[in-house]
Amino acid sequence: MQLSEDEFKTHYWPDRACWSDGKLDRLPKPLQHPVLSSIDALTANYKGRVSFGNAKTGSRTVAVEHISPDMLLKMGLSLYLTEIVRLIPGLTELLREAESAVGAPPGCARIGAFIAPEENGVTCHMDAEEVFSIQLIGEKRFFISKQKGLEQPFGMQFNPGDVTYDDMYPQSTAGFPDPDASEFECVEMKPGSVLFMPRGTWHRTETRGLSLSVSIILRPPSAVESVLDALRARLLQDSAWRRPLHGAWGQGSERIAADQQFTQLLESLPDIANGLTLEDVRQTAYSENDRNENLGPESYFQVKPESTLKLTMKGQSMQAKVIARDVDGREFETMQLDVPLPMIGVFEWLSHTRHAFSAASMAQSHEGLPLEQHLRILLALVKGGYLKPLWYRPLVKG
């Protein structure tokens, strides 16, 4: 089966498993790198963290550093090399392309290499993330099944019979997932084969000889994580939500007062939650660098309390210096620039402003400059350590 990107996204992503076979030369160029064309070359050049285990004896894996992958492989162990992105040029860009293709936030994808000796692999488990397995060397079988007991699992990998993490309990009030209740399908993987497994797919593997594959794993934040992150930023702006529930763990009148306080908080919650937008949620997943690359009129900023903008007139222009303080209390100059006459008013305003503000509000207060110029000034002061780009909308707008 050969699928176009549109066909895959329309009919399979993110909830249906699918696979396709083809030649290695159809794969992205980074996956055709010489180091990934030879297990000997990979184990000789890889210097990062290694997780190893033996599916013949159980699901347990151990992660170590500063060890020879080749030595572990000769001991009959299956290996997972988690840091190949440092070794293979172009893998970082490939991950960003994968994220963009499915509308996932930057940084949520990772890639690792699996090496397994003959008749080994991984024991039956399910992952709480989307997985693309790409076979590069050798052959192996995937046995997969749609997990019936728990839709959209959250948290970590679940291995039946292993110690269960706490977040699985509220997800499994009807009983924990059981692979014995599922019907498995065998997928034959050859060099060039690609398998997509939605989160929650039961799977185990068996190799037919020495095998090398890579997995591209996407872990976008769940709705729970995204909404709670956005909601937290709004609640922290309200002193009523910052106040502890004093007396809640006490008795009598103390607990009654805490219960009244809690009731009032819950009554205010719908209005606060209804004010959230998808953009509020999106912003929580971006790094500061991502936000810097996408500044716009609705971007918000605040002066860092540990930084100072010093302004000195020099004829018809002004010199601006940013002085910042590090975690050890040391002060140092982070940037210096000459400010032309039309921008002096903006810099004077920025040197005195302490409340959060948007790029649009700053531009409206200084209409002599176009918005694009305001954004360039803001970005320069962000990079200089004077301004903090905010990941939330202030309730009191400036």
Locate the predicted segments by residue.
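Conserved double-stranded beta-helix
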Residues: 187, 233-293
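Acidic, low-complexity/disordered tracts enriched in E/D and polar residues
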Residues: 267-351, 379, 390-398
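Active-site region of the double-stranded beta-helix
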Residues: 1-11, 24-193, 201-251
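Short acidic, hydrophobic short linear motifs in intrinsically disordered regions
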Residues: 342-369
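Short amphipathic alpha-helical interaction segments
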Residues: 368-383
